[in-house]
């Protein structure tokens, strides 16, 4: 009887471990562009977040202090859109970031105009650009 209990408990623990390890974050980020301010303080990162077959691509932009590397757990702290795989960024000057996107207004979930001492401007492109 003790052998049977051991086998059952061991099997249940193995199954639980398999379930827990398969519940990893299924989202991934694809880096599109990374640009640094001329004073080398901040890095703007444009990326596409993909959370699997049942979700749309999400163009996102984050601003970090120089030295941060994009991870799959990062989400946009400046801009988050939906249903597009296009996003572009450029520095207008040391304190102004320009974000170009193709997201319709109703598909924009985050759109900051200032973060830290960085002003953020947006250019909405149509699908033909």
What kind of region is each of these model predictions?
Residues 1-10:
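Bacterial N-terminal signal peptides that target proteins for export
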Residues 8, 42, 51-53, 68, ...:
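Generic "edge-of-domain/loop-turn" microfeature
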Residues 18, 48-49, 84-87:
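Intrinsically disordered, low-complexity boundary segments flanking structured domains
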Residues 23-72:
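N-terminal export/targeting and maturation segments
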Residues 10-18:
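Bacterial N-terminal signal peptides
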Residues 72-73, 111:
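Short, charged, solvent-exposed linker or helix-capping segments at domain edges/interfaces
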Residues 22-24, 81-129:
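Acidic, small-residue rich beta-repeat scaffolds with periodic aromatic anchors
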């Amino acid at each position: 009887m003790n052998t049977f209990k051991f086998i059952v408990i061991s099997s249940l623990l193995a199954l639980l471990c398999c379930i827990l390890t398969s519940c990893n974050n299924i989202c991934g980020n694809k880096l599109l562009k990374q640009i640094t301010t001329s004073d080398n303080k901040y890095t703007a990162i444009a990326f596409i977040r993909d959370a699997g077959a049942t979700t749309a691509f999400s163009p996102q932009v984050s601003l970090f202090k120089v030295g941060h590397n994009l991870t799959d757990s990062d989400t946009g702290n400046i801009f988050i859109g939906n249903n597009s795989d296009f996003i572009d960024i450029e520095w207008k000057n040391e304190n102004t970031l320009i974000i170009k996107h193709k997201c319709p207004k109703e598909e924009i979930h985050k759109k900051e105009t200032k973060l830290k001492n960085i002003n953020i401007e947006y250019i909405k492109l149509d699908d033909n650009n």
